[in-house]
Amino acid sequence: MAPAKGSSLTPIQVENLQFPASVTSPATAKSYFLGGAGERGLTIEGKFIKFTGIGVYLEDTAVDSLATKWKGKSSQELQDSLDFFRDIISSPSEKLIRGSKLRPLSGVEYSRKVMENCVAHMKSAGTYGEAEATAIEKFAEAFRKVDFPPGSSVFYRQSTDGKLGLSFSLDDTIPEEEAVVIENKALSEAVLETMIGEHAVSPDLKRCLAERLPIVMNQGLLLTGN
């Protein structure tokens, strides 16, 4: 892709959270562009309460792998296609997911729901076994002593070889070192599946991905406004 001819990807604001158009991780020295961002919340007593803003960052190599199948499709077509989001999840490029808190949450409180969703998906997909149960235990342990005040973040790095790197920050800064790396491909993919897959916790994030990625696939990638 020739950047000079590409489309301009801009940052995204989710409530008071800013998601830059691109980031570079000091832990890996890799750069990622913002595929999309959106809110996650729950309806409590008839009122929608926003708890988290989620941003999905992709390596630029993801664009070509997605474009071979999805270039030329409309945003609505992509939003309506589960296969599109599954292709993002399984694309042969590294992903970095940032989950930043809008309300205070304990690590145990936050991770419990994430783990429930991941285990439910893996069981339904037939990928949950002894290794995955052990990986879930490591996941729980990583969050046990963590608290999330408003504005704090968890970063999930999903490597192409199935590793899931976790890091924690009191703001939106990517830590220089990861807190833990869990070697389990099924769990790694399940984290993103629960966010943008069949039973997505953030329809807003899915909509944003379906709106932004067609522009990149059709016009190339040019990052602005970091």
UniProtKB/Swiss-Prot annotation:
- GO biological processes: flavonoid biosynthetic process
Q: Which reaction does it catalyse?
A: a chalcone = a flavanone
* GO MF term (any one): chalcone isomerase activity
Site feature location: Important for catalytic activity: 110
Q: What is the top EC class of this enzyme, as a single word? A: isomerase
Answer yes or no on keyword Metal-binding.
no
Where is substrate bound in this sequence?
52, 117, 194
| Alphabetically ordered keywords of this record | Flavonoid biosynthesis, Isomerase
Identify the pathway: Secondary metabolite biosynthesis; flavonoid biosynthesis
| E.C. no | 5.5.1.6
What the entry lists under SUPFAM superfamilies is as follows: Chalcone isomerase (SSF54626)
Listed InterPro entries: CFI, Chalcone_isomerase, Chalcone_isomerase_3-sand, Chalcone_isomerase_bundle_sf, Chalcone_isomerase_sf
Give the note: Part of the biosynthetic pathway for all classes of flavonoids, a large class of secondary plant metabolites, many of which are brightly colored.
- Protein family (similarity comment): Belongs to the chalcone isomerase family.
Q: Give the function comment from the record.
A: Catalyzes the intramolecular cyclization of bicyclic chalcones into tricyclic (S)-flavanones. Responsible for the isomerization of 4,2',4',6'-tetrahydroxychalcone (also termed chalcone) into naringenin.
Name of the protein described by the UniProt record: Chalcone--flavanone isomerase 1
Q: Kindly list the organism's lineage.
A: Eukaryota, Viridiplantae, Streptophyta, Embryophyta, Tracheophyta
